[in-house]
From Swiss-Prot:
It comes from the Eukaryota. One of its GO terms (cellular component) is chloroplast thylakoid lumen. It is found in: Plastid, Chloroplast thylakoid lumen. Keywords: Chloroplast, Plastid, Thylakoid. This is Thylakoid lumenal 17 kDa protein.
Amino acid sequence: AESKKGFLPVIDKKDGYTFLYPFGGQEVSI
């Protein structure tokens, strides 16, 4: 996963998906 400006990448290996969440706190699935 690449870091996007204002976002932190999160890799969930258990569920096998990656999502980014903004520093604001709301999760955004991609």
